[in-house]
A protein has these predicted regions:
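Non-catalytic interaction/Regulatory regions outside core domains
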Residues: 2-153
Length: 153
């Protein structure tokens, strides 16, 4: 009887260490999917990043599509940013000083070619597209997100 109790403690301690190690591994892996440059938006806003040169036809179309939906953007707590190689320009919402190069690096974009990236309120990447994202498709995706559904109840 006296030997069983210390063995149980050792097993509990071993399990505790394994759970801690797994939690740390999961946290470090999840962090790789987040956008650190946008951390001040976490839990407050969804962010749509539109990468590409200002004169790119897809960039122009994406921005025009988004600007036509300001009420919908506001309803979904969104911020929209146009990111070129060296600049970040707010399209919708309040923004602070954001490093364009760090943002492009974190999103896997070069800032020259078109890419649309949606970041959820949790800071995770929810969508990457090399094609213009229509407003209906964008809002449908957002409306299916658990945080959005929870906010509507």
């Amino acid at each position: 009887m006296h030997f069983a109790f210390p063995v149980l403690i050792v097993r509990y301690e071993t399990v505790k260490k394994l759970v801690l190690a797994a939690a740390l591994l999961l946290a470090s892996h999840t962090q790789g999917w987040s956008m650190d440059s946008l951390s001040h938006f976490t839990w407050k806003n969804r962010v749509l990043l539109v990468f590409g040169q200002t004169d790119d036809a897809k960039v122009k179309k994406q921005i025009t599509t988004i600007r036509a939906e300001e009420a919908e953007l506001a309803d979904r707590d969104m911020v929209v940013l146009h990111v070129t190689q060296n600049n970040v320009t707010p399209i919708f919402g309040n923004t602070g000083g954001i490093d364009a190069q760090a943002l492009a690096r974190e999103a896997g974009a070069d800032g020259n070619s078109f890419k649309a990236v949606l970041i959820g309120k949790d800071g995770g990447v929810k969508l990457r597209s090399e094609d213009v994202v229509g407003s209906v498709a964008l809002f449908d995706l957002i409306d299916r997100m658990p945080m959005r559904r929870a906010g509507q109840n």
